[in-house]
Amino acid sequence: MDRHHHHHHHHHHHMMSGGGQDPAAGDGGAGGATQDSFFLGPAAAAMFSGAGSSSSGAGTSAGGGGGGPSPSSSSPSLSRYESQKRRDWNTFGQYLRNHRPPLSLSRCSGAHVLEFLKYMDQFGKTKVHTPVCPFYGHPNPPAPCPCPLRQAWGSLDALIGRLRAAYEENGGTPEMNPFGARAVRLYLREVRETQARARGISYEKKKRKKPSSAGAGAGPSSEGSPPPPGGSASGGGDTSASPQFIIP
């Protein structure tokens, strides 16, 4: 008994010496969470889901937290919009690093941004029917078809809004901003029209009719829902406003 007590005391002492470490361990736990979510950023999965599912992914994680404390405690300073913006910026940075021939941010043009958006399509989750498909123009196709999956227009629009802001936050000038290039705006408009026709949906109607319900209620279709409240002009600004509005 005595010996056991001694052993216990020793163990306790060890824990106390670790006691200085215990808060650190707790801290490490939170740090682990922070680091984990940071690690997720550049990691393939989060990147690949890109703009498309990340908006719904962010929705689920925030919703899953439910209480709010857990998501916010892991990253107290960053809103969902800010952390998504950082992830997108990392994704674009990685795209530049892997680019052949090498491409620096300063030499990046609207054409390169379009190249990046087309590259992101391979990680999209939105089926866009081709005109020869029997389901072309059907909002809810009754059966599977071989049409390609793409990034939804709303995802690309929000992605460009975030990257446009990140570019200027990282020292770029507005007049040099490749994400604000006319070619990019025209491309987004074209994608919106193409997808609206292919999927048999109208973005215009949605935009006016239910900005609030689309933001709050449309969980599964969150791919398309974040952008409608803001036009493509202020897509970035609005996406930043709406998630912060939803979380509290």
From Swiss-Prot:
Skewed-composition ranges (Basic residues): 1-15
Domain of life: Eukaryota
InterPro entries, per database record: ALOG (IPR040222), ALOG_dom (IPR006936)
GO biological process, one term: regulation of seed development
Domain ALOG: 80-207
Assembly with partners or alone: Homodimer.
UniProt name for this protein: Protein G1-like6
Gene that encodes it: G1L6
